[in-house]
Amino acid sequence: MRFDLERPSQNASSHRVAVLLINLGTPDAPTPRAVRRYLAQFLSDPRVVEIPALLWQIILRLLILPFRGVASAKKYAAVWMPEGSPLRVNTEKQVEGLRHLLQLNDYTVLVDYAMRYGTPGIPAMLNQLKLAGAERVLLMPMYPQYSSSTTATAFDDAFSALKRMRNQPEIRTVRQYADHPAYIAALAAQVHNYWHQHGRPDFAAGDKLVLSFHGVPKRTLDLGDPYHEQCQQTGALLMQALELTQVECRITFQSRFGKAEWLQPYTAPTLKELGAAGVRRADVFCPGFTADCLETIEEIGMEVRDEFLHAGGKDFHRIPCLNASQAWIAALGEIVAQNLQGWPVQALPVPHTTGA
């Protein structure tokens, strides 16, 4: 194996500790070509699709990418913002918020972000942080619940990059924070703030709150992945914080891909059933997504909304994700600070000298 050439740090004396927020990724543009490139990288990850690689690549290249690239590009175009992809825009705002919060608390740390798929990639950002003087890096996945297909593959990518480095930085990882009190409090604050602005559902009249988490194949649960358990844990704690019962609040799973069985109940059929059963208002919140993206804005806010209304529902509300809300930035800062303990994150005072 050939190791990377080590270049001198550009700022070795200023910042020795870095925090790297990691999210899933996004295409660079809402075009079929860009989306196909992104999906090819995403769906080629063996932690995402666990079937024999050769067989899967034939299916992916011949049957999925040519058609799904066009269809997905249309969906991305429907949610694309003037500044770019919603996930990228929201993640950049989270970086800015966390950086500002840590600076207010006298932390002299670098804060940036990387995407597991697409740009900026994890290896490139690790190298960039090293050039900026980082000798210690905290990897902070923006996935509150651990899963092999999200958290683990992000760490895989980071560790693969380390294997090529001659001079490796010290690494810490945040595995999960599904039950962290600050995270749960931020979720509850987000829901309460939305209800304060748009009105609270009439739960006594049968209105519902649905907590929709990203789905994964059920097979991963059977193989020992803790994701389902942690989603249930987050949901239960959030219900408790909101003082809701399991009759008033449901936990579901969205974004099913392919024909295999995924974690259930599925979000879209659940909303369709609620509408058909006479539920007037349904609010949907996605606690596992820390930033709004295609799956929350388009899938929930458009597709699932239409399913509910066409089935007979009257009032649909998509509660925005945590994004860069004040409560979430404060919670993120608390989680990060706890995981930075023992590292030199604050500037040392310059000793005063006196003349003889």
From Swiss-Prot:
Protein name: Ferrochelatase
Main location: cytoplasm
GO cellular component: cytoplasm
Family affiliation: Belongs to the ferrochelatase family.
HAMAP family: Ferrochelatase
Compartment(s) where it occurs, according to its Swiss-Prot or TrEMBL record: Cytoplasm
Keyword annotations: Cytoplasm, Heme biosynthesis, Iron, Lyase, Metal-binding, Porphyrin biosynthesis
This enzyme's EC code(s): 4.98.1.1
Entries under Pfam families matching the protein: Ferrochelatase
Gene Ontology annotations of biological process type: heme biosynthetic process
Function: Catalyzes the ferrous insertion into protoporphyrin IX.
Residues binding Fe cation: H214, E295
Classification via InterPro entries: Ferrochelatase, Ferrochelatase_AS, Ferrochelatase_C, Ferrochelatase_N
Source organism: Paraburkholderia phytofirmans (strain DSM 17436 / LMG 22146 / PsJN) (Burkholderia phytofirmans)
